[in-house]
Amino acid sequence: MQKAGCRLEHPSATKFRNHVMEGDWDKAENDLNELKPLVHSPHAIVVRGALEISQTLLGIIVRMKFLLLQQKYLEYLEDGKVLEALQVLRCELTPLKYNTERIHVLSGYLMCSHAEDLRAKAEWEGKGAASRSKLLDKLQTYLPPSVMLPPRRLQTLLRQAVELQRDRCLYHNTKLDNNLDSVSLLIDHVCSRRQFPCYTQQILTEHCNEVWFCKFSNDGTKLATGSKDTTVIVWQVDADTHLLKLLKTLEGHAYGVSYIAWSPDDSYLVACGPDDCSELWLWNVQTGELRTKMSQSHEDSLTSVAWNPDGKRFVTGGQRGQFYQCDLDGNLLDSWEGVRVQCLWCLSDGKTVLASDTHQRIRGYNFEDLTDRNIVQEDHPIMSFTISKNGRLALLNVATQGVHLWDLQDRVLVRKYQGVTQGFYTIHSCFGGHNEDFIASGSEDHKVYIWHKRSELPIAELTGHTRTVNCVSWNPQIPSMMASASDDGTVRIWGPAPFIDHQNIEEECSSMDS
């Protein structure tokens, strides 16, 4: 009080706390009488008249006294003092005329033959600090916080302070929990940019033409890249070194590969081509064999695909008005006429498909009851979009506008991210990092931009590519790994700075201070 200028809790409450923890029940009961004027109902009952208020307060005091005496009774029983316990039951608890059903239960504990039996039947920790602390937690609910501090209040405040610092840390990208033991309270929490995936770990050069798309598998162990050179390359991620090596090359996509989708269990890949492509390829990832090559008509344009969560169906479409639902053998299950599709996404409900179209909107299509509804409306063409894991947020790449974040539940534009150069090329952005706290996108100025989800300004601009960066994919299982695909024919793998090399990091990753 003298140093901080504020009172922690009422002196009577402090005495009450100490006497309860010491098991001095007579003194605790006297303290309770002193606290009587300060008692209130935890349910904030609105009462009328002085008599009703008095009766309500009296009832609360009785409840608190009952809890005290119950603990006293159980401790006597555990100590083998049956006569003293019986005295408490008959002469102190019963006269309160409160919760007679509980009185009957308590009386049954007299038949317990040993302490272990008592603790098991009463679901009670036994005499000591643990059970008395629980008792205090219950008693505290009847006292205002200004009279008695809520349980573990200091720990709560410290944890909130740590959480706030982490929320404000632009580069926080770890799975550390909020346990106070895992952080230092001596200094503010700050993550170094060197721990962030803004340093080139590896450059993949096996493609011999523009690389249009890249996507990590759902389990994070593989990366698929699609190129104008007509191939899909599947890369294996080393679990220890996080380096990638070529696993399989899938060939034969005559028009090139502009979009790839992993099945939910990562056993299949579906690959699409650019606007002139009427074919879709379904590959078995493990064997490298082509399971299905689907084409409904040579007039079709199949440029986007999305898997149903059941892994047995997928939807595909394009800007010439095709919108199909198919099985794994390429059989047409359903179709929607006249929808000029730019990008697709299947929601977790297993029946709703989101599709961006040439009317600068995203609509939801239900293939079961054939209903549709407008969800997002933009003023410029939506070139691509992706959905967060929880299905709440949509990340859009909008022609001439850049990257926009929408809340699908409230159907509102949340944020416009600055910095990226977006014309009419199709650029694919992504959510990423721990808890999907970050957003990354390619750009026509040859850079990869990274934002914290809550900040409009980029926190990092990654340089190294020499032409447009078409796609960025964040590893869903390794928050410190990201891949980018570019028209320069390369795929770059980004990760933290090596511990032994701290030179030239500023050239690889420039941070924008907000």
From Swiss-Prot:
Give any single GO term for biological process: proteasome-mediated ubiquitin-dependent protein catabolic process
Identify the stretches annotated as WD repeats: 206-245, 252-291, 297-337, 377-416, 419-461, 464-504
Which intervals hold domain CTLH? Answer: 9-84
Cellular component aspect of the GO annotation = cytoplasm; GID complex; mitochondrion; nucleus; ubiquitin ligase complex
Enumerate the PROSITE patterns for this protein: CTLH, WD_REPEATS_2, WD_REPEATS_REGION
Which UniProt keywords are listed?
Cytoplasm, Mitochondrion, Nucleus, Repeat, WD repeat
* Superkingdom to which the source organism belongs: Eukaryota
A Pfam family this chain is assigned to: WD40
Where is the protein situated, by its record's location annotation?
Cytoplasm; Nucleus; Mitochondrion
Q: How does it assemble?
A: Forms homooligomers. Identified in the CTLH complex that contains GID4, RANBP9 and/or RANBP10, MKLN1, MAEA, RMND5A (or alternatively its paralog RMND5B), GID8, ARMC8, WDR26 and YPEL5. Within this complex, MAEA, RMND5A (or alternatively its paralog RMND5B), GID8, WDR26, and RANBP9 and/or RANBP10 form the catalytic core, while GID4, MKLN1, ARMC8 and YPEL5 have ancillary roles. Interacts with DDB1-CUL4A/B E3 ligase complexes. Forms a complex composed of at least WDR26, a G-beta:gamma unit, and PLCB2. Interacts with AXIN1.
Function according to Swiss-Prot or TrEMBL: G-beta-like protein involved in cell signal transduction. Acts as a negative regulator in MAPK signaling pathway. Functions as a scaffolding protein to promote G beta:gamma-mediated PLCB2 plasma membrane translocation and subsequent activation in leukocytes. Core component of the CTLH E3 ubiquitin-protein ligase complex that selectively accepts ubiquitin from UBE2H and mediates ubiquitination and subsequent proteasomal degradation of the transcription factor HBP1.
What protein name applies here?
WD repeat-containing protein 26
| Organism the protein comes from | Rattus norvegicus
